[in-house]
Amino acid sequence: MTIKNHNYHMTRFITSAPDIRHLPQDMGIEVAFAGRSNAGKSSALNALTKQKSLARTSKTPGRTQLINLFEVEEGIRLVDLPGYGYAEVPEEMKRKWQKALGEYLQKRECLIGLVVLMDIRHPLKDLDQQMIQWAVAMQVPVMVLLTKADKLASGARKSQLNKVRDALLALNGDIQVEYFSVPKKIGIDKLHQKLDIWFSQKAVQVENHR
């Protein structure tokens, strides 16, 4: 299989939607980014695409209340899902977001991969595990990025990485776990490579079904 090197810096914003009913037609291929409200999803998307404000970052966790879609090239999209688990968001809104997340993961046919971002200091909270379990149940491959890796010394960082990898082994899913830090540019290349592999694999599958 030939791995195509996609130009993520050409990525552009398409639309926002409150739930899957308001998303564009379920065609093409999508990789979704999920994580707690302070995990650094928007910063990761901006670092991947080398665009400072493609995904809106905020000092106030929980500002990503919509499903935000970005087009890498025709038919290939990145999806920024609503951040979850932020305490100051009203319960009704939390339930609404979680319903939107669940529906997207379980019903969106063009979803081919899920990137789950977790603060390396506080990984595998209940909702993180639920997202990964949903993906494994739907046979969607997962890349876990342990963000803010620069906040820990190398020994503690390695220990956290091993703990998370060991904890996820029991799920028997297609799960890769890596460090990630935007300021230190750790893990950005691995994310780029993983997305290229996912998009290329799907392109081959589509070609073989023609």
From Swiss-Prot:
Residues binding Mg(2+): 42, 64
InterPro entries cross-referenced by the UniProt entry: G_ENGB_dom, GTP-bd, GTP-bd_ribosome_bio_YsxC, P-loop_NTPase
Keyword Magnesium: yes
Cofactor(s) named in the record: Mg(2+)
GO terms for biological process, alphabetical: division septum assembly
PANTHER family: ENGB-TYPE G DOMAIN-CONTAINING PROTEIN, MSS1/TRME-RELATED GTP-BINDING PROTEIN
UniProt protein name: Probable GTP-binding protein EngB
